[in-house]
């Protein structure tokens, strides 16, 4: 969102949405980890649409305060829901490193090159996380070098001038807000499935 000149402090709220949705889908609905994480990112994006409609018209400190308030509201909601186990949190979330360790045992990688299966699982988890990071960076670079990125830069420089040039400021601010929420939701889902507890 900062690419379009918006200071949003709601990333923790969107990360929470992604983490809880991904964890609940993996725990309660027995969905694969990847599916739960992606759905968590999509739900965070949907929440961004709902929150973004009124808040993207705000600027500066007012937007920062509104999005910070959203993060606190999300925290209080998740601490008081039965499905999230309240203040006790969710434990036993399927772990990405553990799943990869199971695959290492299944494919008989235990002891290969002097590395045990647990280390293989952790190594593969790190490689997957780095690949996701590279993919997100590549997407952000691609967006910045596109027509959308130029619109973001124009809005960041002067949103009134950008609007006079025919750029739909609210549309592009919403787009930046939704993209940021999706990335935060994916990050939250990954966090939940790495730490096994939220």
Predicted segments with their positions:
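Transmembrane alpha-helices and adjacent helix-loop boundaries
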Residues: 1-198
């Amino acid at each position: 969102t900062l690419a379009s000149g918006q200071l949003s402090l709601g990333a923790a709220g969107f990360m929470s949405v992604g983490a809880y949705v991904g964890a609940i889908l993996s725990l309660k609905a027995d969905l694969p980890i990847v599916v739960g994480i992606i759905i968590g990112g999509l739900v965070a994006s949907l929440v961004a649409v709902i929150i973004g409609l009124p808040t993207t018209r705000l600027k500066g400190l007012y937007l920062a305060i509104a999005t910070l308030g959203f993060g606190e509201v999300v925290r209080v909601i998740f601490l008081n829901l039965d499905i999230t186990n309240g203040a006790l949190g969710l434990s036993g979330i399927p772990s990405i490193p553990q799943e990869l360790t199971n695959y290492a045992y299944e494919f008989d990688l235990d002891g290969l090159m002097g590395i045990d299966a647990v280390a293989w699982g952790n190594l593969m988890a790190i490689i997957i996380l780095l690949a996701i990071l590279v993919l997100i960076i590549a997407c952000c670079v691609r967006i910045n070098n596109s027509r959308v990125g130029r619109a973001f830069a124009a809005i960041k420089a002067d949103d009134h001038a950008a609007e006079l040039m025919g750029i739909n400021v609210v549309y592009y601010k919403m787009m930046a807000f939704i993209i940021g929420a999706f990335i935060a939701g994916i990050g939250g889902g990954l966090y939940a499935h790495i730490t096994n507890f939220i």
